[in-house]
Amino acid sequence: MLNIKWIRENQELFDDKLRQRFIEPMAKRIEELDGKKRKITNLIQEFQHARKVKSKILGNINPKSGEEFEGLQRDVKDINEKLEELEQDLNNNNELNELLNTLPNIPDEEVPYGIDESMNKLIRTHGEVDLNAQNKKQHFELGVKLDLMDFEQTAKISGARFVTLKGDLAKLERALANFMLDVHTGEFGFLEVSPPVLVRDNAMYNSGQLPKFADESFATTNGYRLIPTAEVSLVNMVADTIIPREKLPMRLVAYTPCFRSEAGSSGRDTRGMIRLHQFSKVELVSITTPEESKNEHEYMTNASETILQKLGLHYRTMLLCTGDMGFASQKTYDIEVWLPGQKQYREIASCSNCGDFQARRMKARYKEFGSHDTTLVHTLNASGLPIGRTMVAILENYQNEDGSITVPDVLVNYMGGLQKITAYKE
């Protein structure tokens, strides 16, 4: 959620930032609604003060004093009725909060203006693309031919956008998760967490998924939602807390299943493992101070890139433009891996600095030792990485002419010494 005080004091800049996000100016409407809310709040405070004064006088008067006592009683009763009416008006005046809840984060000054992904900015590349590679198969062709990846029978169980992995591909999935967790905990100092994957609506609201993206998640019949990313569970670990400054940055990593309805993705990536309803992902989250969040963003992006470097995969890092950024983010890097079977780059990681946007929603603060003042933390998240898309990249980049898959060197020990994935044999 955005800072209403900042909006009030920077109306022109606020509207300009909204235009960069392709949203109509809202400053005047917010000022009107905010003014109405503040007026009611001030009246409530005035009446509460009057009630306190009259109640104190009433307590010092003999009940047998007659008209003066009865008059004060009537005054207190009238004040209580007026307060009840004003508080009801305040509770019913939800338009301001509803409007603020639909507004995305303000883009950082370093974010380029742009309409869509075609206007994202290239930051760096790693490795080289073999443009002469011919007859490279896509991952689902390889997996099905090896009889280690099943879509047809799985569709009978769960429908479209699900997959079953078998044998050495199931083992590769487990190996990748262990490898990623080892790198992030051992080399980058993230604390491994095993969080819930069922959360309440308020947790989804805190992280920015609700109310705007309600139709993109799976809801249970008893008030829970399946997480679309472990970011939801991890950032909420500091909801409604005040963290000692010396405990920051708080770096967390989790490996969880993730669930997405893929609403609005009809017809896109209908084959293969690129866009599934259920997938596994290693997620990074950092809680830090406003002064350190930019450096932390680079640190986390480096952690994600390191996984791809160790796997020997070619990728490029893009700075997203204003029209392609996520709702809660003020600055995002996307890491795109090269897929020779598709002959294109595909997003494999997203690394975002959300500033105090999520912290304001979930009331997450920190304070310096010995101080009574508190400040909103900054929250950051990064894919570290999605297991399925990483497997896609390995299958397409490490495929051999006979259809087998060479296991990347860094994963051989995690695969029990296996160096090549071949067709399943019963």
Curated annotation (Swiss-Prot):
Catalysed reaction equations from the record: tRNA(Ser) + L-serine + ATP = L-seryl-tRNA(Ser) + AMP + diphosphate + H(+); tRNA(Sec) + L-serine + ATP = L-seryl-tRNA(Sec) + AMP + diphosphate + H(+)
Compartments, as annotated in UniProt: Cytoplasm
Pathway note: Aminoacyl-tRNA biosynthesis; selenocysteinyl-tRNA(Sec) biosynthesis; L-seryl-tRNA(Sec) from L-serine and tRNA(Sec): step 1/1
PROSITE patterns listed in its UniProt record: AA_TRNA_LIGASE_II
NAD in keyword set: no
EC number: 6.1.1.11
Main location: cytoplasm
UniProt-annotated binding residues for ATP: 260-262, 347-350
InterPro entries per the UniProt record, alphabetical: aa-tRNA-synt_IIb, aa-tRNA-synth_II, aa-tRNA-synth_II/BPL/LPL, Ser-tRNA-ligase_type_1, Ser-tRNA-synth_1_N, SerRS_1_N_sf, SerRS_core, tRNA-bd_arm
Binding site for L-serine: 229-231, 283, 383
GO biological process: selenocysteine biosynthetic process; seryl-tRNA aminoacylation
GO CC annotations, alphabetized: cytoplasm
GO MF assignments: ATP binding; serine-tRNA ligase activity
UniProt keyword terms in alphabetical order: Aminoacyl-tRNA synthetase, ATP-binding, Cytoplasm, Ligase, Nucleotide-binding, Protein biosynthesis
Subunit annotation: Homodimer. The tRNA molecule binds across the dimer.
Function: Catalyzes the attachment of serine to tRNA(Ser). Is also able to aminoacylate tRNA(Sec) with serine, to form the misacylated tRNA L-seryl-tRNA(Sec), which will be further converted into selenocysteinyl-tRNA(Sec).
Similarity comment: Belongs to the class-II aminoacyl-tRNA synthetase family. Type-1 seryl-tRNA synthetase subfamily.
Entry note about domains: Consists of two distinct domains, a catalytic core and a N-terminal extension that is involved in tRNA binding.
PANTHER family reported for this sequence: SERINE--TRNA LIGASE, SERYL-TRNA SYNTHETASE
Protein name as catalogued: Serine--tRNA ligase
UniProt lineage: Bacteria, Pseudomonadati, Pseudomonadota, Alphaproteobacteria, Rickettsiales
